[in-house]
Amino acid sequence: MNHAHSQALFARAQARIPGGVNSPVRAFRGVGGDPVFFREGAGAWLTDVDGNRYVDLVGSWGPLILGHAYPPILDAIIDAARRGSSYGAPHADEVEFAELICATMPAVEMVRLVSSGTEATVAAIRVARGFTGREHILKFEGCFHGAGDPFLVKAGSGVETLGLPDSPGVPSALAKLTLTAPFNDLAAVERIFAENGQDIACAIIEPVVGNMGVLVPKPGYLEGLQALCQKHGVLLVLDEVMTGFRLSRGGAQELYGLKPDLTTMAKVIGGGMPMGAYGGRRDIMEKVAPAGPVYQSGTLSGNPVAVAAGLACLKALAAPGTYARLEEVSRMLEVGLLAEAKAADVPVTVNRVGSMLTVFFTGEPVYDYTSAKKADTARFGKFFHAMLNESVYLPPSQFEAAFVSLAIGEPEVAHVLAAARKAFRSLGKTG
């Protein structure tokens, strides 16, 4: 497969953009080689600058649940842009959007729009601290909540791929306010709360981890965490940046029957445009300025073009049978990938919840940061490039989730599994 134009663009990019990319995991450091540069996407397919086409299992890292260039979203974007790309003032669509989010997400009574997932999580932590008067937060090893300073402690995802346990530039005094516990270990949370509970403002967690690869919560784990938070007066912040409107229409909180105090959202709610949000209990959200004293603002918050895209996306997802169809296709991929790996005698573990999945190159169960780290990243890199050569675009890191879109049908599933058959067999021969 020819990638000459991609290679030339990457050489140019490295002269002006740090590492040649605008987000670290895109640089292919986790798999080796040079990144592919793309020129367009349509439905389930991406086309690169050299004209190669790929079934896309990245989906812009989660937002594109309806696939690329979904016509109703494009129409909404064009119509909104014709009326003005930004107002810097209130408008009717943002009210409708807020009402739709609150009507759909079980624990969200009020919501504030922002422009990214990181902005949402940083603001949620500030609100939790302001509401409780406490300074410490608890996060979970391998969970990634964006690039905000409080979260770059055992953060997984691109940080792990780069081999950086934390990021330089995060003050040690600030890092000390972030406590960590292993994912799926309630006993560890109990110990931390027993020792520090009176100082902890909130526990923030990805209900299904997507940034250490997909980690599935053990039965009762999330419910137990919620109960411990309530016992100790610690706010539960559910980071649904990935899972919101993806695992079910009401996100992971609907799927697992949770009632978090605060929820963060992004990705799917923007329909492919820059969008984030945080919301939750009315008494907490009324502390946000200008209703209350906790300050947060943004020039492009509630941007009319992004809101129009988000509205079109969420309305499309409300169609009957949408999530059942997404589950069916995702399950076909999971079962097929496991079967092809087994046929090639390549030990893997496939973790999946809904339309999020990861193929871990280990035969052992993967349920937390430590077990995920045991995966064979070199072997994953070989698998990634073998799949790329067979026109399948996977996340370029062992520690990222693949995302299935509604644009993927049986022909695309067959294409992916045929590619996987060749890729697994090549690994079986060469290691």
UniProtKB/Swiss-Prot annotation:
Entry EC number(s): 5.4.3.8
GO biological process: protoporphyrinogen IX biosynthetic process
Cell compartment(s), UniProt: Cytoplasm
Taxonomic superkingdom: Bacteria
N6-(pyridoxal phosphate)lysine, modified sites: 267
Catalysed reaction, written as an equation: (S)-4-amino-5-oxopentanoate = 5-aminolevulinate
Needed co-factor(s): pyridoxal 5'-phosphate
GO CC annotations, alphabetized: cytoplasm
GO molecular function terms noted in the UniProt entry: glutamate-1-semialdehyde 2,1-aminomutase activity; pyridoxal phosphate binding; transaminase activity
Record keywords: Cytoplasm, Isomerase, Porphyrin biosynthesis, Pyridoxal phosphate
Pathway: Porphyrin-containing compound metabolism; protoporphyrin-IX biosynthesis; 5-aminolevulinate from L-glutamyl-tRNA(Glu): step 2/2
The keyword Isomerase belongs to this UniProt entry's keyword annotation: yes
InterPro entries per UniProt: 4pyrrol_synth_GluAld_NH2Trfase (IPR004639), Aminotrans_3 (IPR005814), Aminotrans_3_PPA_site (IPR049704), PyrdxlP-dep_Trfase (IPR015424), PyrdxlP-dep_Trfase_major (IPR015421), PyrdxlP-dep_Trfase_small (IPR015422)
Major localisation: cytoplasm
EC top class, as a word: isomerase
Quaternary structure annotation from Swiss-Prot or TrEMBL: Homodimer.
Record-linked PANTHER family: GLUTAMATE-1-SEMIALDEHYDE 2,1-AMINOMUTASE (PTHR43713), GLUTAMATE-1-SEMIALDEHYDE 2,1-AMINOMUTASE 1, CHLOROPLASTIC-RELATED (PTHR43713:SF3)
Family: Belongs to the class-III pyridoxal-phosphate-dependent aminotransferase family. HemL subfamily.
Protein known as: Glutamate-1-semialdehyde 2,1-aminomutase
Biological source species: Myxococcus xanthus (strain DK1622)
Gene that encodes it: hemL
